[in-house]
Amino acid sequence: MSDVVLEIKNLSKSFGKNKVLDGINLTVRQGSVMGLMGENGAGKSTMMKCLFGIYTRDEGAISLLNKSIEFKNPKEALESGVAMVHQELNLCLDRTVTDNLFLGRYPTNFGIVDEIKMFESASSLFSSLNMNVNPKTIMRTMSVSQRQMVEIAKAVSYNAKLIVLDEPTSSLTEREVKKLFSIIRALQKKGVSFIYISHKMDEVFEVCDEVAVLRDGKMILSKPVAGTNMNEIISAMVGRSLDKRFPDVDNVPGEDFLKIENLKTKYAPVLEDISFTVRKGEILGLYGLVGAGRSELLEALFGIRTIESGSISINDKYLKFKSSKEAMAHGFALLTEERKLNGMFGKDTIEFNTVITNLNNYKTIGVLSKRKIREAANREIETMRTRCLSADQGISALSGGNQQKVIIGKWLERSPDVFLMDEPTRGIDVGAKYEIYQLIIKMAKEGKTIIVVSSEMPEILGITNRIAVMSNRRLAGIVNTKETDQETLLRLSAKYL
């Protein structure tokens, strides 16, 4: 009997004249983890949509356990043992864990939903997977990591032979990542196979047996992880060699510019006694564990969270923002962590998203000028090197990296003095990351004061001048980037736990 679970042969897919998949071949073996990498727009999502029946393939064949398949929709795929855990989890947050597990297939007894059987089945399932989850818990009260466990357990309950994990660690702490990996390894021993889609190379090398790399719709590399290295994978992804993971941080910070003194926020989660200074043209990293208060601090600086006491000043001029509109008027910009929820209008165009925060600048005699709007959009497309068809294209059609470029371009149109960036490269491929790093350093050289939140320690060490570390919503310390290391950052992040 063959140990091949999934085999994709010569898979091709076009949209009009644009060929997004070109003769893809991929083999996933039983009990193995196949890493799938590639720049945003390389074809990973299209490939998965062809597998799950969302798109109809133009050419090629897909087989599951040596049986030819062509799913009509994801539900049919799930019932056949092929499941996907999305980056943005697909759950009913106001229902219990048990309800989510059995949604659409409730066990009944004489036509009545058998809640006792559901609870017992759910408890047994979590026990078999060594997951500490209470089936009666409402999903909304659970952490992202716990919700993810529920999604994986749901896949297992369908007797899944293959589980696709899409950027599974993007919102997880280091401890939660280790828990996820232990679950993956336990399921591997039971014969379950995985496709692990990620931009995080260190994770691919840790948890995957094989790795495949897509570029421009073609399979560039597919081999055992043990037989490759980081440089080969990067070269396969971007089509060129990246000698360094990070550009040179060669900006020269100037005099003190932004000063925070004894800052305390009013509503939970409360930040307490936050004091620090950022210089003009400086890149200050903000590091801490999930829940440390990093995002909340940026929100307080941007007028989203109410400040109970303390002060914010620029060039010794005290400021008090009652809204984000006031913060923007004083030269602040905020790149949010959840770009799809808070950073863009997903149903609108690149052009609309570029100009929406600065409409008064595109008026002629009080009337919006289509010419000025188009010029602004095209200017930012060129500046950010955004890969798109035109400014009229819907932003939702772009890859994650290109969406982020549009959002950054939107703020650059306002020429901010202080740029607050919350996880600016989250869910973005290595090539696009490098471009955003270059942009951050370029902005600092132009005199902008930048605060960057990142959960990736190599990133926070690779693109900053200094690093402020948060612990339990308090400032644990500030260190010079060139004089610190990962151990110091971890020790500071646990200071007030």
Curated annotation (Swiss-Prot):
Q: Name one GO cellular component term.
A: plasma membrane
Q: EC number(s) for this protein?
A: 7.5.2.11
Compartments, as annotated in UniProt? Cell inner membrane
Q: What catalytic reaction does the record list?
A: D-galactose(out) + ATP + H2O = D-galactose(in) + ADP + phosphate + H(+); methyl beta-D-galactoside(out) + ATP + H2O = methyl beta-D-galactoside(in) + ADP + phosphate + H(+)
| Residues the record lists as binding ATP | G38, E39, N40, G41, A42, G43, K44, S45
PROSITE patterns listed in its UniProt record: ABC_TRANSPORTER_1, ABC_TRANSPORTER_2, MGLA
Spell out the Pfam families in the cross-references: ABC_tran
State which residue ranges cross the membrane: none
The molecular function terms of the Gene Ontology recorded here are: ATP binding; ATP hydrolysis activity
Membrane topology recorded in Swiss-Prot or TrEMBL: Peripheral membrane protein
Keywords recorded for this protein, A-Z: ATP-binding, Cell inner membrane, Cell membrane, Membrane, Nucleotide-binding, Repeat, Sugar transport, Translocase, Transport
Subunit field text: The complex is composed of one ATP-binding protein (MglA), two transmembrane proteins (MglC) and a solute-binding protein (MglB).
Q: What is this protein called?
A: Galactose/methyl galactoside import ATP-binding protein MglA
List the source organism.
Treponema denticola (strain ATCC 35405 / DSM 14222 / CIP 103919 / JCM 8153 / KCTC 15104)
